UniProtKB/Swiss-Prot annotation:
Residues 1-30, 105-243 form a coiled coil. It comes from the Eukaryota. Transmembrane segments: none annotated. The keyword Coiled coil applies. Residues 253-278 are annotated as: Disordered. This is Coiled-coil domain-containing protein 121. Keywords: Coiled coil. InterPro entries: DUF4515. The gene is CCDC121. The keyword Lipid metabolism does not apply. Pfam families: DUF4515.
């Protein structure tokens, strides 16, 4: 009986120890389960985060690629439009330059005509001086001849034997002298009028030629200035086109150097299926 009680007590003591150990194990189990849940949640969150990260990177890549492509297309469109405008302006300037070349050719013809007119002006001036000199010489000759004839008639009328001449003879001589004077005056008058008319005509032609020469000179100067202006405008347009081409080349290089992969990055299988279920 005593042994039985002893065994019962031992069994109760062992049972109590086992219960205590069982409770301790249960507490440790709960603690481990709590820690496991925490790590499981942490791992789950990290797994979802890492799983979503490639998709975010891919979406960011697509967005940046689309933005870069849009900017590239806008730049290309602006560049093409500017080039078109510049080409149109350059074509207009080439047409103007072609027209200017034709005008310059006409200007050369005008210069030749101007040189010819200047020679004609010089010839007319020389002829005018020559005619004036000849007129003065002939006038002096006629005056000398008339003066000589007048003196001869006066001598004949004043000779001592004039009493021997009849009244009729004297009247004839007087009439002849008067007629000679009138003829001389008429000749001188008509000759002077003719010379004056020729001089007036020469002056008129000379003024016309001088006026034409002045107009030709003004036209030539205007065409030369216009030619220089068009050459400067053409040089400016060509420089502007070259500058825009260099600027576009630099812009394209900047776009190519941006942090965008040249090839489409491959996504994880799970991300691809999430983006495109097909």
């Amino acid at each position: 009986m005593t042994d039985l009680n002893k065994h019962i007590k031992q069994a109760q003591t062992q049972r109590k120890q086992l219960l205590e150990e069982s409770r301790e194990l249960h507490r440790e189990k709960l603690l481990v389960q709590a820690e496991n849940r925490f790590f499981l949640e942490y791992l789950t969150n990290k797994t979802e985060e890492y799983t979503e990260q490639p998709e975010k990177v891919w979406n960011s890549y697509l967005q940046k690629s689309g933005e870069i492509e849009r900017r590239r297309q806008e730049s290309a469109s602006r560049y093409a439009e500017q080039i078109s405008v510049l080409k149109t302006a350059l074509l207009q300037k080439e047409n103007i330059q072609s027209s200017l070349k034709r005008k310059l050719q006409a200007m050369r013809d005008i210069a030749i005509l101007k040189e010819k007119q200047e020679k004609e002006i010089q010839t007319l001036q020389e002829e005018t001086k020559k005619v004036q000199a000849e007129t003065a010489s002939k006038t002096r000759e006629v005056q000398a001849q008339l003066l000589q004839e007048k003196r001869l008639l006066e001598k004949q009328l004043s000779e001592p034997d004039r009493r021997l001449l009849g009244k009729r003879k004297r009247r004839e001589l007087n009439m002849k002298a008067q007629a000679l004077k009138l003829a001389a005056k008429r000749f001188i008058f008509e000759y002077s009028c003719g010379i004056n008319r020729e001089n007036q005509q020469f002056k008129k032609e000379l003024l016309q030629l001088i006026e034409q020469a002045q107009k030709l000179t003004a036209t030539q100067s205007h065409l030369e200035n216009r030619k220089q202006q068009l050459q400067q405008e053409q040089w400016y347009l060509e420089s502007l086109i070259q500058a825009r081409q260099r600027l576009q080349g630099s812009h394209n290089q900047c776009l190519n150097r941006q942090d965008v992969p040249k090839t489409t990055p491959s996504l994880p299988q799970g991300t691809k299926s999430r983006i495109n279920p097909k």
